Amino acid sequence: MTTSNNHPNWPSLSDRQGLLRDRFPVWTPLTLDGLLAKNAQDYPNRVFVLTDRQSWTYAQMHAWSTQLAAGLCHLGVKPGDHVALLMANFPEFIAIKFAIAMVCAVAVPINFLNKRDELGYVLKQSDAVMLITMDSFRNMPYCRYLDELAPGWQVQGGGDEFPKLKNVLVFATGENGSDNISKHLLLNASFGEGLVLPPGFAPAPNALCDIIYTSGTTGFPKGVMLSHDMLLRTAFGSAWARGFEDGRRIVFSLPLYHVYGYVEGLLACMFVGGSVVPQLKFDAADTLSAIEQHQATDVLLIPAMTMALIDAQKVQPSPLHSLHSVISSGGRAPASLWQDILDYLHPQEITTGYGMTEVTASSTVTRPSDGMTRWLTTNGRLRDVGPAGEPALNQRLVVYRVVDPVSGQEMPPGQVGELQAKGPGVMKAYYNKPDETAAAFTADGWLHTGDLGYLDAEDYLTLVGRLKESYRCGGEQVLPSEVEDVLMSHPAVLQAHVAPIPDERMGEVGVAFVVLRDKMSCESIALEALCKERLARFKQPRHVLFLSASDIPTTPSGRARKFLLSQMALESLGLITPL
């Protein structure tokens, strides 16, 4: 066996990929429950999921998920039904996720930062027949939201407002008492106990597995439809491209309702019989402690998290001897970040990349052998996924072309245009949104990403901006129109326009430009309170600026020119010198 030069006891990338090829020499389409069953047989006593208090082997997780699946079946969940899952990174999320697959149902993971109306929209639009929710988490009162959305939900499910929602199960997090919730509605250790999962459930690999909601240009979230095999081929591709060693152990606090933590962490580790240490929330000290305590070899981060870890290491360094790999992706990163990772986290391999829910997760990554220049100047190379890839696409699942957004002409290497994606890793449709689906694709079947960038001659991709007005705050996508609608619900507000500005910690943050009605007044604190009440934290604007209608730069058709608003915000806040 050969070894990496910078870590003499570590297998080389070719050896690690060889192990994966030995286990999966030819790609055979898989399902989530099928992969869990395979690992429960191949690695029954290997730890799969760890917390600071408990761990579950593959065999134990399979048994737990089977029990939960029997409980779901007993409550009437049928193949093809949609089961909404509003839960943080508890082990129960993982167990119920596989249970949903076992009964051939479709999971609808929901962002647990969603407020009442956001939750209601997803429940209705997804046609969920069941909701599995926490009672509360980080002071988010989900049961109160249900009381307001669907009074009597404990007895009649969604009622008239959500006629397809038949059952709600509640997981008690321990934050608040759940004494007022009937025991038969609780997702606890006894749920499904004594029941037997009927035979005959066998989801097809190309069957719908998840509907994962992402913001879009319509002002409302859109449900991206992903099959079992799309998810697992992409997850295998992550393990292949990053060179997972046997038994890789991954720490992350990225939420499992996102493809980043779900695909690149939970599912990817399964292909090497590895384990995950999911954390309920991000805390730099806790993350470093988890790496040490559980001897993790990998950590999944967005740049804001990476910078927080580096800051913590500067104050009270941990040795992190086990940490071999760091992936930092999903937002803007300062140029100093990559050297700081080497200096303070000491990994042997660093990865960054680019992806989105519509392409199932990462579709470009830097290679383990890449160095500082690639980290600084690119978002990775089109990802070779080994045996899981398409031979016609050079063993890739997603390929990109760069197109002039005005003329539609394909651009040569090095020229900036809109990035468009195609391949078996690209979604087929948004759930129950035919118009949005049609608008998302070109006439010849390429997905509009809405991002501007370029490819070089070696297929490395570099992002330079966004065609869309949406932006990412802390890795979460924000749609300005959604924030603007909330601001304009205030009686004193005539116009509201939200535009992003760069932020070293969060990647981008929103600035709200507000025009007040004549003879009416309003303080920024009132608008901030309104947003705090109605919107998830990452959607709340960092700054509120007041101006007159004549000061809003507009197109001839009267639409606000957001890139000029971003420039105005930077000048007004003193972050750049006015031109």
How would you label these PLM feature ranges?
Residues 4, 471, 497-503, 511-515, ...:
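Conserved C-terminal "lid"/linker of ANL adenylate-forming enzymes
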Residues 293-300, 310-383, 399:
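Gly/Ser/Thr-rich phosphate-binding loop
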Residues 57-59, 209-233:
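Conserved AMP-binding A3 loop
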Residues 30, 75, 86, 409-414, ...:
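Conserved ATP-binding/catalytic segment of the ANL
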Residues 75, 105-184, 518:
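Structural core segment of the AMP-binding/adenylate-forming
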Residues 44-45, 162, 169-170, 175, ...:
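Conserved pre-ATP/AMP-binding loop-to-beta segment of ANL
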Residues 24-29, 33, 37, 45-90, ...:
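Conserved AMP-binding/adenylate-forming core of the ANL superfamily
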Residues 232-249, 257-298, 311-312:
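Conserved AMP-binding/adenylation subdomain of ANL enzymes
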